[in-house]
Amino acid sequence: MWKLNRWLSSIFADTILYKLVFMEKLQPNLFFPLAGVAAVASLASCSNKQKPVEQKPLNIVYIMTDDHTAQMMSCYDTRYMETPHLDRIAADGVRFTHSFVANSLSGPSRACMITGKHSCANKFYDNTTCVFDSSQQTFPKLLQKIGYQTALVGKWHLESLPSGFDYWQIVPGQGDYYNPDFITQNNDTIQKHGYITNLITDDAIDWIENKRNPEKPFCLLIHHKAIHRNWLADTCNLALYEDKTFPLPDNFFDDYEGRPAAAAQEMSIMKDMDMIYDLKMLRPDKKTRLKSLYEKYIGRMDEAQRAAWDKFYTPIIDDFYKQNLQGKELANWKFQRYMRDYMKTVKSLDDNVGRVLDYLKEKGLLDNTLVVYTSDQGFYMGEHGWFDKRFMYEESMRTPLIMRLPKGFDRRGDITEMVQNIDYAPTFLELAGAEIPSDIQGVSLVPLLKGEHPKDWRKALYYHFYEYPAEHMVKRHYGVRTEHYKLVHFYNDINWWELYDLQADPSEMHNLYGQPEYEPVVKELKEEMLKLQEQYNDPVRFSPERDKE
């Protein structure tokens, strides 16, 4: 394939150069393709023509974490912590300010990402009943077909073994923070010593350095376990942020008026956060629902790791039980402990992103590599009194998305159009020069990376959450989001509608559904919802006829 590109390049270079210079008139945001038939590296004068230099196809490093919310990245929100290495990605590229997922749950979100299709199309609806059909089309398989090397390290969480990768090494299920097991391509399970975020990064760098063909472009998926519950920090970071006190979100003590589905959840920091499993307040005489699972996790630590762990937590445990906190004081204590543990886990993640960036720069790969950072979904940091995700409300539907752009991209700063995780697959395919199959439901972000603002860009996003009854008891629901409004329908064992004005009520506290003055808005949004359900062929659809009953 690369020989064909060189041959075509030699024939068509002058033609392409003419088009770039005279037809495009060298616009300031001119986009030079980094993969495909040919790319001109320098402009030769008419009197002294030089042989055009072939631009190598770009590499893709796609870093995804678990449950990393945008408000815990300083390139999005400076109130809580600094993430200098993640900020480097945003500073050298773009930050998407309206980035969302199609189903805010780990496995389904990953299936949407890798297929470019909604859950109703890729058939991976939830974490409890589904196994990913690995025979279906994915973007790594399509990249392989055009000569890319593909690799996956870290979290997979789709139940079946990965396919479409020249190399993979994954953690089983959620994985463990300390001394975790990994499944190899031989379907063997091995245990590695250390902290999982460091180990996944080690494997990623080792693959680039020692296991790939340097003559071929590559796509590497670095998918971390962090920052998933129950936020076990690396021992070197245990003491961080202990001097910080965080204000409770304004709606921490939300009463869920007019929102019965929100009231029925079981993800409250005050009521549902486990004192031992989540907050590490382990004592032999105390029992909680998830105590044994926590003991299993810390039981993986070696002697030195456990000694450091106990040295840090023992005085905190003693002080906590001595205080005998109750009510709102206890809720605030739990929130502070949760915030600190979460941030310590983020710190390890940010440091390891820095390791990857430094390695790519040292090896001369950074200028020809697209570096993408995102999370499988957002997360609640006390908003509505919650932890976890699942709901279509902003904190869990919204996810960070930043891209460090390769040489040849002039675009910098914020991209404000609404994008979704089904858009990643077609974006990677277009940038690599691959054909985008017609059944992919996402839309390539390349026009946005070129600085364009397409007039026909989507005006609404579709969302559908299926996993109920299950952990946290978030009811099934689907909905649409526009720049101004969000309409949500909870169904199955409930029939409840919610409407939010996102500009007047960004915290989504006031359900406007049923108010006469909003009937035209509801009518328009229901029409949009039905249109998207038909477009994506979702068998669970809003029925205008039943809605009148």
Please tell me what each predicted stretch does:
Residues 19, 24-491, 495-497, 506-527, ...:
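Formylglycine-dependent sulfatase
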Residues 9-10, 45:
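Serine residues within intrinsically disordered or low-complexity segments
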Residues 502-504:
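Extracellular, beta-strand-rich glycan-interacting domains
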